[in-house]
Amino acid sequence: MKRCVPLEPQAEAVCQASSKPPLIFELPVAQGRMVLEEAQDSPVYKYPARAKRVVVNTGRWGAIPVYLVEPETVCTPANVILYIHGAGWVFGSYHTHEKLVRELAARTGSLLIFPEYSRSPEVRYPTAIEQCYSVMCMVPELVRNMGYTANPDTFTVAGDSVGGNMATALTLMSKFRRGPEIQKQLLYYPVTNACFNKGSY
């Protein structure tokens, strides 16, 4: 049974405007990325937080930008969230997710680490997930460089859509490889099934 969820008028207006063809996945990759980036340019409230961009070497998987987001108030020892962005493995960036991750950091008092992994079609599986795993293994060092000590009892992996898929995969990889101990998952509408004809889709 389908359930209708009422939206705020502003959200409904965005949905209506973005439902007109061509849809983002129907555009050439570069154009689709530009459309998504520009959609996030409108002025909106962003929670107070400092963001620092660093470049992290993930070994054979290459160097990638990683954003370290620090809210005004941080718990001690620091709760840490590793956030993996969604948008189909093809789109998405720190810019498209900045409002969300700043709010998540500010409202939880957590340090947030955001790897801007290499996207398809420029790279193929397993590059993106291995890059994220490498960054996850570097979390204690990244947090120390921010002047904090990470709280191992609250380490959280989070993500939206395919980012939720990757956060789930990171949890399994870490278990099988005996890597960092993940305590919590925060998954926003994660991709857990590729079937488009199921009720959950």
Regions found by a protein language model. Name each.
Residues H95-F114:
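Short amphipathic alpha-helix adjacent to the substrate-entry channel of hydrolases
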Residues M1-P71:
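A glycine/proline-hinged amphipathic helix-loop "lid/cap" segment
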